[in-house]
């Protein structure tokens, strides 16, 4: 059996491949794991794509998850295309809709023992670029569900957009994988700490990308309530 350490995430994550070429992911567990597994099972039953299936627990107490083939992004050196951003936001909407009837009562999540509020659903809570899976530049799924727990869908969307949309023209963003990116920016390494003064250059195209992402993630009946 071949194994490969996967950097990032919560640490201690390995991809193992058996003699038949089947890849699996081994990850450390915690007190929140049963609640996360129940969520993933619910999403699978609802037919949501782009979610790793839970395959069990190994003899060392690690969870065994389906491996989602593709590549992940490093926000410091990678960028996603506008098309991938819109697809990710659309997937986020489908996820929230699939999770809406998952009401586990008071459950232990990574954030502590919590119960869903009336206006809450179980959110991913960490849908940044680094947890996207891309195939040929296209959004294909979301990984690292350890921080899932009660929240508001708008907060998941805000996190996704904060991670995926450039905040100002001075950000030096790399060439996106798989398509165009708004606003256009020179190839290089991004540095969010340099975003001390906003620039209006590129705002129109950036706003359009953000609007497409918001529309993809927001049910039509709620769009009229979106500011602006």
Positions of the model-derived regions?
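ATP-binding glycine-rich loop module of kinase domains
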Residues: 2-41, 66, 72-77
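Active-site acidic catalytic loop and adjacent metal/ATP-binding pocket
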Residues: 12-18, 54, 112-156
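Protein kinase-like catalytic domain
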Residues: 44, 96-100, 165
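Conserved HxN/HPN-centered segment at the entrance to the catalytic loop
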Residues: 44-57
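Conserved kinase catalytic-core helix
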Residues: 75-108, 120-125, 130-135, 185
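Active-site activation/catalytic loop segments of kinase-like enzymes and analogous catalytic loops
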Residues: 157-189, 205-213
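ATP/Mg2+ or Mg2+-diphosphate-binding catalytic cores
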Residues: 208-228
């Amino acid at each position: 059996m071949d194994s490969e350490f996967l950097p990032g995430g919560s640490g201690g994550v390995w991809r193992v491949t058996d003699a038949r070429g089947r890849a699996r992911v081994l990850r450390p567990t915690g007190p929140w794991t049963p609640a996360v597994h129940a969520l993933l099972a619910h999403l699978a039953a609802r037919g949501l794509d782009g979610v790793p299936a839970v395959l069990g627990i190994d003899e060392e107490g690690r969870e065994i998850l389906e491996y989602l083939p593709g590549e992940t992004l490093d926000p410091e050196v990678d960028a996603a295309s506008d098309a991938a951003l819109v697809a990710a936001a659309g997937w986020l909407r489908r996820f929230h809709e699939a999770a809406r009837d998952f009401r586990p009562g008071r459950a232990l999540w990574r954030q502590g023992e919590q119960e869903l509020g009336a206006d809450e659903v179980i959110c991913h809570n960490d849908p940044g670029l680094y947890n996207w899976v891309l195939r040929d530049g296209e959004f294909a799924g979301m990984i690292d569900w350890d921080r899932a727990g009660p929240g508001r869908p708008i907060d998941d969307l805000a996190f996704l957009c904060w991670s995926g949309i450039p905040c100002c023209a001075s950000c030096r963003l790399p060439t996106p994988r798989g398509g165009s990116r708004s606003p256009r920016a020179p190839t290089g390494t991004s540095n969010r700490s340099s975003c001390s003064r906003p620039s209006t250059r590129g705002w129109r195209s950036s706003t359009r990308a953000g609007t497409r992402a918001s529309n993809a993630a927001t049910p039509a009946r709620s769009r009229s309530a979106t500011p602006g």
